[in-house]
Design a protein with these regions (language model features):
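Catalytic center-proximal scaffold of phosphoryl-transfer enzymes
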Residues: 1-356
Length: 356
């Protein structure tokens, strides 16, 4: 019956909410236990982990609706979407790994490879292109799997009725795994192409210009700086054909530079920054880079911090919910979910008793 009152792992909502919150804000579960002890709140290390993972598991299995307000949608709003990848280390079992000679005790052997959490942001813009502070953003991520990331983003957008949005900007860096899926995902959801704008982050494009100019020979540093400034101005003003033509001449047929120029050829339709400014759209993907830093890096990229795939993904999800300002929405939805689940079970039991 404890679940009827919203309990998780025999913990009351206020307790498991606080435990779970500390688990994704603190650098480790040891620090969570230390804080609880300092505040004279009862807690045990194993139980703290179980509660945090249990909350993460329950919310994770209902992740699209658990952090949304009832009836939340983006109808008639200007929406910005952005995707990027971060880095975290995972604990992956390796039974073939040789044990350390300095460590004789028997324990499971594992590797700690770096993996890429792929995170997306959904936010609402004001008419002037600034972020609407009255709307809560949506952050979520999956580890490694680009298709899962795309499917998850599509799930959120479908729930938000993205096809009814007034305008949509999809902005990111030049990673092919992003752009291979971006437009097709939105079109499948019924989004009109006339509403959709795609853009490469301006500052990533500038980095590619700088990389190309840095490889030029027999040009001094001062002239290279002037060239970068000139080409940046062309890029900003939307003079892309002039920019590509100028860099092609500078390359003098060198294959290395011509290969780098393919970046601009492939993304020329996504670099119309003059048109973006006319429509009051941002030209940078700072919202997702900020989210990567706050959601992933500050908690899951620390030295010697690694866990198994499933647990890390659950904690990333909980941290994303908290940093999006949706924690209380999630907890209230979780209580209702537990209540509804138990009610359904009680009805089933009552029905079976009547039949017997």
């Amino acid at each position: 019956m404890l679940e009827y009152w919203g309990c998780v792992h025999k913990a009351a909502p206020a307790y498991y909410s606080y435990i779970s919150m500390l688990s994704i804000l603190c650098p480790s579960f040891d620090i969570v236990l230390q804080i609880l002890n300092d505040q004279h709140i009862q807690g045990e290390y194993k139980r703290i982990k179980k509660i945090a993972y249990n909350v993460g598991e329950t919310c994770f299995s209902n992740r699209i609706k658990i952090g949304l307000k009832q009836g939340e949608h983006v109808s008639g709003k200007r929406v910005i979407l952005s995707v990027d990848g971060g880095r975290t280390r995972l604990r992956e079992m390796n039974p073939h790994k040789k044990p350390s000679k300095s460590y004789k005790a028997k324990r499971a052997k594992f590797d700690t490879p770096w993996r890429e959490p792929k995170l997306f942001v959904i936010h609402v813009l004001n008419k002037d292109g600034s972020i609407n502070k009255h709307e809560l953003p949506i952050y979520d991520a999956v580890i490694n799997d680009a298709d899962r990331c795309s499917d998850l983003l599509a799930g959120y957008l479908k729930k938000l009725r993205i096809e009814t949005a007034a305008e949509i900007l999809f902005i990111a860096d030049g990673a092919e795994w992003i752009w291979n899926r971006a437009k097709s995902t939105l079109l499948k959801l019924g989004v009109s192409e006339t509403k959709l704008s795609e853009a490469i982050d301006y500052f990533h494009a500038v980095e590619h210009i700088s990389d190309i100019i840095s490889t030029l020979r027999k040009i001094d540093k001062q002239k290279k700086t002037a060239l970068v400034k000139e080409l940046k101005k062309m890029l900003w003003d939307g003079k892309l054909e002039q920019l590509i033509s100028k860099m092609t001449v500078l390359s003098k047929g060198r294959k290395l530079i011509l290969d780098k120029l393919n970046y601009f050829h492939k993304n020329i339709s996504r670099m119309k920054y003059d048109q973006l400014r006319q429509h009051n759209f941002p030209c940078g993907s700072g919202i997702v880079e900020s989210a990567i830093r706050r959601v992933i890096n500050l908690r899951f990229k620390s030295p010697s911090t690694f866990g198994n795939h499933d647990n890390v993904e659950k904690l990333i999800f909980l941290r994303a919910i908290f940093l999006a300002g949706r924690w209380n929405i999630m907890i209230n939805n979780l209580i209702k979910l537990n209540h509804k689940f138990l009610q359904q079970n009680l009805k089933l039991v009552s029905h079976l008793i009547i039949l017997n």
